[in-house]
């Protein structure tokens, strides 16, 4: 039936519930100071921009882009693990005494155009970008003072890739710029010596890691610090709590910066503004703490490679599904592409990003700034996922139902946005909809159904209590609008 007279109280209860679940973020207070320990750092509210953004682009770019074989772990797979495929690849294609360092001079990036990249990411519908400033091979994409002769200014491109991309992103778009930074380096002698001393000394952290972390933040002002390569040492060795406390308290990005959860073994899914937990993490159920699903369009490698076939790439439909299922459960997506050594992005990656941008242009209303609904996945139809508008304003609640599979057989769909088996307490307390009076809850007087992208087309629908029966517009009309991959119904209840 209609919204209860005690709607204001119930709306307040919705806000309390969401806040308790850490779904809605807040801007941290400018004078709050955090101590260098997890108990204090974990109290920091998540900056609102990150929760609203939902979609980011990840870039794995570096010397490993030169051999373009296997994955970005090329060096250690070849020299450390002695993987036969990598060993044979080198034997077939390079002289016997060839070293990984020699790839750096071939990392030319002569076609790298930061403006072109920025415009593509803007068109993709992403709201933030994260670039690998340094991967596990230790090569930096900026002229690090602590990586002499092993950075993009001294060898290879002879350019500050980080600086150029940061400037272009900020000039050409409203996207936020972030940096990935690997803590450990496979073959750095300072790191290997610290390990030989059972991590009882921290020479690598003191002389390499901490100076570079500070340099990156102070010079390039990244609003995402995406830490990695942490798992071989505890956070105390990396002095992670000290660094994060400085980020939150005194850094030039203290009010807006966000960090992930890779700060030493045991920190994953435990500490950080958002949790990655693992690569390609997508639990499919609501998570209380903000999280991020980092996945790569090439299913196997994060770096660009040529030993790849079409089936190794995610389809545009799969990308859209990953966005929907992640955002419905309180996550963001970080979608990775690997540029070529020349500085170009392969057409297949560009196609996926532009397809995503077109889809978000029509359906982004249900993605950006949304929060989870009381149900993430439809009770009966597993191909339907839900989000809702953040605020229940003007006595209205707006739900978005994302349909992943088109009902070709009937052109009709039954969904249960309020749940099939009504739990009066749960639904009334979380929605403000009084379900205890019987009769139709969803009706023409209290409910409006619109298909995003076809707002000018009246949608035929009817309801039986909590079941909503929707008739799609003719498929050829939908196709003419360029609506593909997944279809969104906006359900407004007053």
Curated annotation (Swiss-Prot):
It catalyses: an alpha-L-fucoside + H2O = L-fucose + an alcohol. Keywords: Glycoprotein, Glycosidase, Hydrolase, Signal. Residues 1-25 form the signal peptide. It is an enzyme of class 3 (hydrolase). InterPro entries: FUC_metazoa-typ, Fucosidase_C, Glyco_hydro_29, Glyco_hydro_b, Glycoside_hydrolase_SF. One of its GO terms (cellular component) is lysosome. GO terms for biological process: binding of sperm to zona pellucida; defense response to bacterium; fucose metabolic process; glycoside catabolic process. Glycans are attached at residues 113, 377. Alpha-L-fucosidase is responsible for hydrolyzing the alpha-1,6-linked fucose joined to the reducing-end N-acetylglucosamine of the carbohydrate moieties of glycoproteins. This is Putative alpha-L-fucosidase. It comes from Drosophila melanogaster (Fruit fly).
């Amino acid at each position: 039936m209609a919204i209860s007279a005690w709607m204001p109280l119930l709306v307040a209860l919705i806000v309390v519930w969401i806040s308790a679940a850490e779904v809605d973020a807040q801007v941290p207070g400018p004078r709050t100071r955090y101590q260098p320990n997890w108990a204090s750092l974990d109290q920091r509210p998540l900056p609102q921009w990150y929760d609203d953004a939902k979609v980011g682009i990840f870039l794995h770019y570096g010397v490993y882009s030169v051999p373009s074989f296997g994955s970005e772990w090329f060096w250690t797979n070849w020299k450390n693990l002695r993987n036969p495929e990598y060993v044979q690849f080198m034997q077939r294609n390079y002289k016997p005494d060839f070293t990984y360092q020699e790839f750096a001079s071939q990392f030319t990036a002569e076609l790298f155009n930061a403006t072109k990249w920025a415009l593509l990411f803007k068109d993709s519908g992403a709201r933030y970008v994260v670039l690998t400033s340094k991967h596990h091979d230790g090569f930096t994409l900026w002229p690090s003072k602590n990586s002499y002769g092993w950075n993009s200014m001294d060898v290879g491109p002879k350019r500050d890739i980080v600086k150029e991309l940061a400037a272009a992103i900020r000039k050409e778009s409203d996207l936020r710029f972030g940096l990935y930074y690997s803590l450990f380096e496979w073959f750095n002698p300072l790191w290997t010596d610290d390990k030989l001393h059972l991590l009882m000394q921290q020479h690598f952290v003191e002389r390499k890691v901490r100076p570079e972390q500070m340099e990156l933040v102070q010079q390039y002002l990244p609003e995402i610090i995406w830490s990695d390569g942490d798992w071989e040492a505890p956070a105390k060795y990396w002095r992670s709590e000290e660094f994060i406390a400085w980020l939150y308290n005194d850094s030039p990005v203290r009010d807006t910066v966000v960090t992930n959860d890779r700060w030493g073994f045991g920190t994953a899914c435990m500490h950080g503004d958002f949790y990655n937990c693992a690569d390609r993490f997508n639990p499919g159920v609501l998570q209380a703490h903000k999280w991020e699903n980092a996945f790569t369009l090439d299913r196997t490698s994060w770096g660009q490679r040529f030993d790849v076939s079409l089936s190794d790439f995610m389809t545009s439909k799969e990308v859209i599904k990953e966005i929907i299922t992640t955002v419905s459960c309180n996550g963001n997506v970080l979608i990775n592409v690997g540029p070529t050594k020349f500085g170009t992005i392969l057409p297949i990656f560009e196609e996926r990003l532009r397809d995503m941008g077109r889809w978000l242009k029509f359906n982004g209303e249900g993605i950006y700034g949304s929060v989870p609904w009381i149900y993430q996945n439809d009770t009966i139809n597993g191909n339907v996922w839900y989000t809702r508008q953040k605020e229940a304003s003007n006595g209205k609640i707006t739900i978005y139902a994302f349909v992943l599979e088109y009902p070709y057989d009937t052109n009709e769909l039954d969904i249960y946005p309020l749940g099939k088996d009504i739990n009066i307490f749960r639904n009334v307390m979380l929605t403000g909809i009084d379900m205890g009076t019987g009769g139709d809850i969803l009706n023409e007087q209290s409910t409006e159904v619109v298909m995003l992208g076809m707002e000018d087309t009246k949608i035929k629908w009817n309801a039986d209590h909590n079941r909503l029966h929707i008739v799609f517009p003719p498929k050829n009309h939908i196709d003419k609008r360029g609506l593909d991959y997944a279809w969104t119904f906006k359900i407004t209840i007053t």
